[in-house]
């Protein structure tokens, strides 16, 4: 069955003129409220995956589940939280069953668009005790929800991936529901961490609710609603302005994944883009059938990645709102990789989504020159670690996404050592890693020659090495090992990602493996990809090549291979 999805905004022009200055004040107040939620979570979270890596998103929604504001944290969650909010409200019986002080827990992948370890906390917001004005929500990564491992690349159904909380009231009228709380504790290997992070999320949604109430009470609900219409209109105009610059027509391209995590072999997928004026359709209906392994993307995830791509492209640096999404139509076919049917596994849907964003840009870069960057390293190059805790006999778990090089663009070199452009996460400090986990960080270095050559070179990837101080298990999740990050406008490809297990019996490539056992003294090495180059390398200036040599970003051999025009000069 073919399905289409579009933002549910259905507004007419506001009936009264609203002071544009007041609209801006309310818009920025909403952005500030979402940022306050973010700061509250960071300051009170238990796990580094939240307060250092920033694997979360906080947002505010109107009563129709349209996004008023989202904090600048994890763009990959953009658009999925609205699905979470709507699904969680539906699961508890609809708006009529909501009361002031209710808080809902939701993590069903098919309603949230994330894997089950991304748990959403949703709070309806009221004024005058019974007038619903909107919702606050925070989705954050929990270290373990009771799946077959704390993180898996080889699940064959959604039930292996963790406990599903399909919209449960954690608080009713301000009172904790003890049975739900006990259920959460009983279904995690690291309950202290989960409860600590849950409490931080609760603080965050409450802070956002208070802020939203202050805004509405200060300006009045009618003025607030009219201003919101103007805010959505502004967001829509921004995106339509960019889309209208794309020539009308149908464009298409292919992406691929190294494997689906269970079966051997590359998984290729096709995306079509149809442009008509300022309207744009992203067509995923020719995707392969849903996969046996966990790279399937539930509909909310597919919608989210499309929204991220065009918000970054057209958002002009503004924090997004629902208006950004109105010009976009997403078309899928049920039962395929980008619209699977439960219980198909989907734990790694985020990795497929990362490829979607860059394939969209690749397709458009071939039609619209000088706008889109070259490919990044294309992956989070992540690891999730766990163990029994030999020193204190307490199980532990942690996650570590590793930065990559970003693609070069028209006018500049790619950014070095930064997480994927749709992830927005960051690397934990070495001191945090070593103080909380039984390993030593032997190496974190910029990877010489990992960048793609060009008039503007790509960013560099990293080389990292972790040495185990006790028996440890790790799941590695690394894509783009079989095909390198591409260049644009005759720019060259960059180094691909790879992971190497270093044991007493030798070295082994392990880019996508679940539950690898590492003994004391063994190490694992991550080699993250660089960014592709932009423009012909022959056009790169002597000055820039010389500076790259001085900084040891590239070697003499690299220069000889890619920059034959280089002339040595006296320093």
Feature locations, PLM:
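Glycine/proline-enriched, intrinsically flexible loops and inter-domain linkers
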Residues: 2-100, 105-128, 132-281, 285-570
């Amino acid at each position: 069955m073919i399905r289409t999805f579009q933002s549910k905004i259905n507004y007419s022009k506001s009936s009264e003129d609203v002071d544009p200055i007041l609209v801006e004040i309310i818009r920025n107040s909403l952005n500030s409220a979402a940022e306050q939620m973010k700061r509250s979570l960071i300051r009170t979270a238990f796990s580094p995956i939240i307060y250092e890596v920033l694997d979360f998103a906080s947002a505010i929604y109107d009563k129709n589940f349209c996004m008023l504001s989202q904090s600048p944290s994890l763009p990959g969650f953009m658009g999925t939280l609205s699905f979470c909010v709507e699904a969680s409200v539906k699961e508890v019986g609809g708006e009529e069953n909501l009361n002031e002080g209710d808080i809902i827990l939701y993590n069903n992948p098919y309603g949230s668009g994330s894997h089950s370890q991304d748990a959403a906390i949703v709070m309806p917001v009221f004024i005058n005790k019974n007038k619903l004005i909107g919702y606050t929500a925070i989705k954050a990564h929990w270290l373990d929800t009771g799946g077959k491992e704390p993180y898996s690349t080889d699940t064959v159904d959604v039930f292996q991936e963790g406990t599903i909380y399909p919209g449960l009231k954690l608080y009713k009228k301000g009172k904790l529901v003890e049975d739900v709380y006990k259920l959460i504790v009983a279904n995690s290997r690291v309950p202290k961490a989960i409860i600590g992070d849950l409490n931080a999320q609760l603080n965050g949604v409450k802070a956002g609710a208070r802020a939203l109430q202050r805004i509405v009470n200060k300006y009045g609900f009618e003025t607030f609603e009219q201003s919101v219409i103007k805010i959505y209109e502004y967001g829509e105009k921004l995106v339509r302005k960019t889309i209208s610059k794309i020539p009308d027509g149908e464009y298409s391209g292919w992406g691929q994944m190294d494997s689906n995590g269970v079966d051997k072999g590359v998984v290729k997928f096709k995306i079509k883009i149809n442009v008509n004026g300022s309207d744009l359709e992203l067509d995923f209906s020719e995707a392969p059938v849903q996969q046996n392994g966990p790279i399937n993307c539930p509909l909310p995830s597919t919608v989210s990645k499309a929204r991220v791509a065009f918000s970054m492209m057209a958002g002009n640096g503004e924090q997004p709102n629902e208006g950004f999404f109105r010009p976009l139509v997403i078309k899928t076919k049920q039962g395929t990789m980008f619209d699977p049917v439960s219980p198909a596994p989907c734990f790694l849907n985020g990795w497929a989504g990362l490829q979607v964003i860059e394939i969209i840009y690749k397709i458009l870069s071939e039609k619209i020159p000088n706008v889109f960057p070259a490919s990044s390293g294309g992956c989070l190059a992540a690891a999730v670690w766990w163990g029994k805790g030999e020193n204190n006999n307490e199980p532990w778990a942690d996650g570590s996404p590793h930065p990559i090089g970003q693609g070069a663009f028209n006018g500049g070199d790619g950014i070095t050592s930064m997480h994927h452009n749709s992830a927005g996460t960051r690397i934990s400090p070495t001191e945090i890693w070593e103080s909380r986990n039984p390993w030593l960080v032997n190496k974190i270095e910029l990877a010489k020659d990992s960048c793609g050559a060009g008039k503007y070179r790509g960013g560099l990837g990293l080389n990292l090495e972790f040495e185990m101080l006790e028996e440890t298990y790790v799941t590695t999740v690394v894509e783009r090992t079989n095909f390198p990050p591409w260049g644009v406008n005759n720019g060259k490809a960059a180094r691909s990602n790879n992971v190497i297990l270093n044991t007493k019996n030798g070295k082994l490539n392990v880019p996508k493996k679940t539950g690898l056992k590492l003994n004391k003294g063994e190490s694992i090495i991550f080699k993250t990809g660089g960014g592709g180059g932009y423009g012909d390398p022959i056009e790169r200036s002597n000055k820039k090549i010389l500076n790259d040599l001085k900084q040891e970003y590239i070697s003499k051999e690299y220069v000889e291979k890619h920059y034959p025009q280089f002339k040595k000069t006296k320093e």
